[in-house]
Amino acid sequence: MRLPWVIFCTVLLLIFTNNSNADIPGCNYYDTVDISYIERQNDSYLYDDIEIPASLTGYYEFRQFGDGSITPIEKHLRACVCSVRPCIRICCPAKNFLANGKCDDGLKEELARFKPYIYFTYMDLQARVPLTDMAIIRDEFFDCDEMIYISDFNYFLEEVSIQIFNKCGLIVWFQDGKFWVTVDLFMEKQDYCLYRHNFDSDFPKSMWIIRHRCTSHISPGSLEILIITMICFVLTIAVYLYIKKLRNVTGKCIVCCIVSRFIQCLIMILDHLNLLNGICSPAGYSSHFFRMASNLWLSVISYHTWKVLTSLNRVDPNYRFLRYNAFVWSTAAIMTGSIYIVNQIWENDPSKWNWLPLVGFIRCSVKDWHPSVWIYISGPSLALSTFNVAMFALTAIYIRKVKGGINKFTNEEEGRINCINFDSQTYLQFLRLSIVMGLTWIFNVIPYSARLHIFWEWVGIISEYFHSAFGIVLFVLLVLKRSTWTLMMDS
């Protein structure tokens, strides 16, 4: 009877051992760096010329964010580098991150050229420390990041005594003041990072820092839904290209819209999986180009549908599709080119950072948090969505008018009086029109800043899931209908 008990205890021990996280004792997660790509030498690891003993390393199976949330990731080795040297966090754009986790933005060369330093005070000790003698942790940008000039806090710091700071830990001293940057009162160490283009001015008398205001996560299951959506996109395109009667102007516009949305979804997935190293910026501009193109195609489809249904001439001339192409691709190119020029001109100017589109900084796409998104994304999208709603309303009114006329004529012929009656096919037709004409995309215009309210937060979540499944909805409404299957059988 003892052997089964021993086996049971052994199995439990293995389970708890495998599921436990090998945290480094006495080390904060934000004081660690990923050293999975560094080989072990003489019972230590060499990280940026800093020798870290193996006793200060451990395996982690999670990633911790500034808001305290944890995401499971692949098991990797981390080292408590801040136990060896004082640390400073400097932001690194997504476009400069390499596959091994290093940042290739020329920071080392700039530090060697300008030789910047900061003053540290801990308890009663003060020291002037060059940044080249510190452990530099390259921090990433997040969705709600905000650029802050450090002198904005000086007036507040003057009211706080030095004794309060000394109890709290690290202080950054300037020649004409002091600024606390670590724990407990203003910002935790994970809530900020220094801006890269800081050291050619009057640093450290003043500096620009990036404040991480929030951490966003991809909604559970949305990545899987996007993959299924892309499969449905491919199937829908194949059906529209296979059936000759669907290769009219409307069908071609739908195919172009789906292709644009497919490329946008593909870049989004690759960006989330960190597979765009080396091509982050080109991928980000391409994503914006095809995002705006798909929105423009929805407006073209809305206009063309209204034009065809309300026109006595139902013939679709080929030149009309060529005009649509010229309008969509040129407009999308102008929109993308404008944000490219803005980024190139003011990318290194911290004072204008908050208003930049920041392609390749937060992710490989245009940022979507700040009033400036109304210039680059939300404003144009709202205008196009409003146009789509207007076209749908005019089309629906026309269909209702025609249906009412037909019902009235039928009732007069049969000698009876009846109210206008819409059957299920009519409602299904309205549903298809609302989807094809992009009626629902107006909810996607809600900025993330407005989603801090609980109601708009839920509207945003529902909209995100629905539009992640947009390809599935299109496939069901356009391909799985009876008329499409009949055309497929006849082809």
UniProtKB/Swiss-Prot annotation:
This is Probable G-protein coupled receptor Mth-like 7. It comes from Drosophila melanogaster (Fruit fly). It is found in: Cell membrane. GO terms for cellular component: membrane; plasma membrane. One of its GO terms (molecular function) is G protein-coupled peptide receptor activity. One of its GO terms (biological process) is cell surface receptor signaling pathway. The chain crosses the membrane at residues 168-188, 223-243, 253-273, 326-346, 373-393, 435-455, 459-479. The gene is mthl7. CDD domains: 7tmB3_Methuselah-like (cd15039). Keywords: Cell membrane, Disulfide bond, G-protein coupled receptor, Glycoprotein, Membrane, Receptor, Signal, Transducer, Transmembrane, Transmembrane helix.
